[in-house]
Amino acid sequence: MKYISILGASGSIGTQTLDVIRAHPDEFRLAAASVGKNIEAARRLIAEFSPSLVAVADRDAYKVLYREYRGRTTIVYGEEGLIEAAVCPQADVVVTAVVGSVGLVPTLKAIEAGKAIALANKETLVVAGHLVMAAAKRRGVPLLPVDSEHSAIFQCLQGERMEHVDKLILTASGGSFRDKTRRELAHVTVEEALCHPNWSMGAKITIDSATMMNKGFEVIEAHWLFGLPYERIEVVLHRESIIHSLVQFRDTSVLAQLGTPDMRVPIQYALAYPKRLPLPSAKPLDFISLGALHFAPVDFDRYRCLRLAYEAGKRGGSLPTVLNAANEEAVAAFLAGRIPFLAIEEWIERALERHRPVSNPQLEDIREIDADARAYVRSLLS
């Protein structure tokens, strides 16, 4: 029996993680969860899974739940509450499914507490990959990727030696606007952007997919997880999202992991590792009805956010922190209807250009740089 803590249990990855726990009551049990401000999600979690601890985002939600569950479930709130969920004594595995850089400190605390990390929060490695990987190595803690692309690479590398790897190839659907021209992108709406062709995801990551910043973050994440330089991490467009990623070896052999687009598969793989469990609710791949798979090169002029991510990753230091902070603020402004779609990439580029890089930022540096980049992007609205 593995006890699971989910940071972000009311979001897309979090709810699908609950599906996996629900499907295997003899394998997994929910020890703790965070749910943001979603009081109803907290009530449902407590009723079904009886976790020992539930974290909420603010004091108002805390007051409501504390009155209802005092003496039955520990209710905590704020950043400290999120950390408490991350270091819950009963938890064996912590699923980091919160969105954005808010996941960094709880992840570091969970690593320090010796928890296995099922990593769904890619921003953690984007802003502080050097700190996270060093902490995991120091504590001997496994980082198990939940992103479908990194899970695919991780699976392809089982039993292999990294010195035999030539390159990693991440696949990308192209997002909700893959068939639109740059001219058409100037006028797209929020509603159009939120319609991903293949995956069901939260709002922020769906926009990141449309700009391809999500793929840029995944390139940086792959660099840290697998230790390869950026020159040996490629991205290829693959409309069907059936091949989740590939590994090419030095003898030109290629291994790929395939499957229908269903995030419960990589989630379950991370939770159950090194075992493989059945997943009856997942749809098996039917090659006959599939017919064909399609691939195309990435146009870096078309997807400027992906180019910016590669550049920030290669230069390293504090630039990926600025990349992430500026992206979060710009995407929030787009979702609020305050800026057009193409302004997202423009604002990120401006934030990167004004930043004076720090070569080896520590946690306090990262917090200051993050806050400064956010303040700058917000100032562009006024």
From Swiss-Prot:
* Reaction catalysis annotation: 2-C-methyl-D-erythritol 4-phosphate + NADP(+) = 1-deoxy-D-xylulose 5-phosphate + NADPH + H(+)
Residues at which Mn(2+) binds: D147, E149, E218
Class of enzymatic activity (EC top level):
oxidoreductase
Cited Pfam families: DXP_redisom_C, DXP_reductoisom, DXPR_C
Could you tell me the keywords of this UniProt record?
A: Isoprene biosynthesis, Manganese, Metal-binding, NADP, Oxidoreductase
Statement: the UniProt record of this protein carries the keyword NADP: yes
What is the E.C. number?
Answer: 1.1.1.267
Q: Name one GO biological process term.
A: isopentenyl diphosphate biosynthetic process, methylerythritol 4-phosphate pathway involved in terpenoid biosynthetic process
The entry marks the following residues as binding 1-deoxy-D-xylulose 5-phosphate, namely K122, S148, E149, S173, H196, S209, N214, K215, E218
Cofactor dependency = Mg(2+); Mn(2+)
- Give the record's pathway: Isoprenoid biosynthesis; isopentenyl diphosphate biosynthesis via DXP pathway; isopentenyl diphosphate from 1-deoxy-D-xylulose 5-phosphate: step 1/6
> Which Gene3D superfamilies did the record assign?
1.10.1740.10, NAD(P)-binding Rossmann-like Domain
Chain residues that bind NADPH:
S10, G11, S12, I13, G36, K37, N38, N121, E123, G202
- Per the record, the domain of life is Bacteria
Task of the protein: Catalyzes the NADPH-dependent rearrangement and reduction of 1-deoxy-D-xylulose-5-phosphate (DXP) to 2-C-methyl-D-erythritol 4-phosphate (MEP).
Family indicated by similarity: Belongs to the DXR family.
Question: What is the protein name for this chain?
Answer: 1-deoxy-D-xylulose 5-phosphate reductoisomerase
The UniProt gene name for this protein comes to dxr
